[in-house]
Amino acid sequence: MTHEAPAPVRFEPADLGLFAAASHDVNPLHLSAAYARRTAFGERVVFGVLGALAALGRLSPQPGRSLAKLSVEFAGPMFEGVGYAVEVDESSPLRAKVKLRDGRRVVLRLTARFRDAAAVAATPAGDALPPPRTEAADHPDAALVAGLALTGRYAAAPSALAALLARFELSPRGVGSRHAEALLLASYLVGMELPGRRALFSDLALDFDAASELPPDPTAPLDWTLRLDAVHPDFGMLSMSLATSIAGAPAARGKLTAFARHELPAASDDALEAAVGRSEALLGRVALVTGASRGLGASIAHALALHGCTVIGTYLSSAAEAEALAARLSSTPGRFIPLQGDAGDPAWAAATRATLLAEHGRLDLLICNACPALRPLWLEPASAQRITEHVARSVAMVAVPLSHLLDLVAAQRGSAVVVSSSAVVDPPAEWPHYVAAKCAVEALARVAAVEQPEARLLVVRPPKLLTELVNTPMGRQDALAPEHFAARLVRRLMEPGEPSRDVVLELG
């Protein structure tokens, strides 16, 4: 019979820290906020195996039984602070199924099979081995070939492992320290060894040898062999086999599947210049581009600088990327000036206005490009608050710059661009918040065109671009390089044009 647990599963930062300490998996997607912000997820992702341990902890006690087999599908990313509903099916005495859901969207599916057993080792024993790696391996795609095999020796950190077992009350549920240690090993291997730094765990299936639950030497570490069975290069998917032993005796074996996330390719400076050209046509003009450190914003800033424009490029936290862009653009006829700040903060916008007037005396172009990270959501009770928060945040990141700076643009009879999306015409499922936000900022542009008739207001709707927003194994398929769209936009901005209430600009 299937039932929903009365309380949701919720992960806090301390849970991620405890898991990392126990497993030695310190992959930056899970632990570094700065790194995670540069991915499609926009923030730290909860370890998949941590989710599996939490799901096992919601089973009924299993007296006289021990975990024999476990399969887990990590169906979607999990995040800190979100309450995940727990659906448990224990209709079979030796099999249990658990789903973690964010509303209707399943983020984890787990099936556990048990065997009759006298006991499981409830607490880890022995000394921790030094972790083989303290930094995740970063293999190039060319090195990920079928037949690759890795071997090693592993031991979870005993005190942290004991704390994890207690945190989720696993021992009464037939999950002992050796079971948990094998799961932590799987997380470590995927996140730190293969594929390593770019890993996104997809699923696992493990069979546990009964003799390994109470080995003759409880202090013995796990010896492991990980073999890469197949690589699916289109999606960066790796299929792997894992075998472990304790003091020479088989312990756990199974299959692991993970994606090697593709890093975004560096923007092609040559391709951008070939598409947009180089001149001094915008010499003396000043532009402000929000969200300019990466992706489309960086390409727009680059294209403007190629024609002599002084570009103030804002960023929230990507200082290194902004400084690197400034260095790249130092050879252009224009200039790129990084400016840290939150585009949705009125105090920041007021200070930016004062700086613009004091240092430049004008603003000719305003490009409202910044937007929040995007998570999939449905229109349902579990998502309602996050939908409204996303829309409010998105609107602020356009409304605040327009409110504080548009009159400066109008004084120069310049242009203000609001970056929308083709999704407003063809809305994808799971993006109600994104589509609503883009429709709202388009409406702001229409009203702004009425309020400031001396400024040329433009709304652009890019197609799917290869930026962090879509850089997942499936999402990146058929995405276009942002520099090509940026080139088309800047070429159009350089053409003469009169203000109009027909603000949507079709760029093809």
What do the PLM-derived regions correspond to, one by one?
Residues 309-324:
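Conserved glycine-rich Rossmann-like NAD(P)H-binding loop of the short-chain dehydrogenase/reductase
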Residues 1-11, 64-143, 208-287:
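HotDog/MaoC-like acyl-thioester-processing domains
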Residues 381-400, 441:
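Catalytic Tyr-X3-Lys loop
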Residues 293-294:
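Conserved glycine-rich cofactor-binding loop
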Residues 261-262, 396, 454-455, 459-461, ...:
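C-terminal helical subdomain
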Residues 2-67, 115-205:
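Hot-dog-fold acyl-thioester-processing enzymes
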Residues 345, 371-388, 430:
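Conserved mid-core segment of classical short-chain dehydrogenase/reductases
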Residues 274, 372, 415-440, 445-450, ...:
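Catalytic loop of short-chain dehydrogenase/reductase
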